[in-house]
Amino acid sequence: PVLKVEIPKPDGGIRQLGIPTVMDRMIQQAIVQVMSPICEPHFSDTSYGFRPNRSCEKAIMKLLEYLNDGYEWIVDIDLEKFFDTVPQDRLMSLVHNIIEDGDTESLIRKYLHSGVIINGQRYKTLVGTPQGGNLSPL
């Protein structure tokens, strides 16, 4: 299971993170290193957060390029509690369609179902994905 901790957000809200064990973090990093190059072509070209070879500066440069091309509107979407409500079966279906590797899929599913520890008590996780581990950005 991951240790659930609450981090204050600048707007006064709370961001809940799931902190994995050191061993889980190492295994997750190995998964990320293998999966990132496979998954990268499937991501939106306009997505810049937590992506290799992308940065705030590159996002701003792309924005300026759009402005120079005549675009006038920007849409900024922040879905509240998005990661807490991701349907795990749908996520795993997408993972399967991209990587088609049963062993890796099984590991990811185990992390999704590993549960959380809150105040020393363990709880099951049937929906959502933990934020705070190496797999989070992927």
What is each of the regions a protein language model found here?
Residues P1-E6, P10, H42-T46, F50-R54, ...:
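Conserved polymerase palm-domain catalytic core
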Residues I14-F43, G128-L138:
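Conserved pre-motif C helix in the palm subdomain of viral-like polymerases
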